[in-house]
Design a protein with these regions (language model features):
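N-terminal beta1-alpha1-beta2 submodule of the flavodoxin-like/Rossmannoid cofactor-binding fold
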Residues: 1-116
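Short, conserved loop/helix-junction motifs that constitute active-site signature segments
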Residues: 116-128
Length: 128
């Protein structure tokens, strides 16, 4: 049984919500554990490009946590707990929703597996 997470970046009760819930219903019928989240319902601040997450990882001082203490960790924890993630976003003016862009910015390099692997190698070589 897999854990399936659906992240909806559309308006509440929008077509995006409806489509994701329909997919989740099929997943549940197939015996999978499901979770639906709307990041718009949470307090998630936009990335300010301070690179605190990256510097923390590279220096070995932190695990790459964002300097903001908001609800992003709820989405992050659900994302890492899931075996499959389905993301839905409407397209506004040829771009995804602003909340989805914020999610991508906040999930940036501090969550990139290649970057994290390289940072661990550097820390190991430097004796940290």
């Amino acid at each position: 049984m897999a854990k399936v997470l659906a992240l909806s970046f559309g308006r509440k009760m929008s077509n995006t919500d409806v489509m994701l819930k329909e997919v989740l219903k099929k997943c549940e019928e197939a015996g999978h554990e499901i979770k639906f989240m709307r990041p718009d319902d949470l307090e998630i601040k936009p990335c300010i490009g301070c690179c605190g997450c990256v510097v923390g990882i590279m220096s070995g001082r932190t695990n790459g946590a964002c300097v903001f203490k908001d609800d992003f960790h709820l989405v992050e924890d659900a994302y890492y707990d899931a075996d499959a993630v389905i993301i839905g976003s409407p397209v506004y003016e040829t771009s995804p929703s602003g909340t989805f862009k914020t999610f991508c910015d906040r999930f940036g390099p501090s969550h990139d597996l290649a970057f994290l692997t390289e940072a661990k190698k550097r820390a190991y070589r430097s004796g940290q």
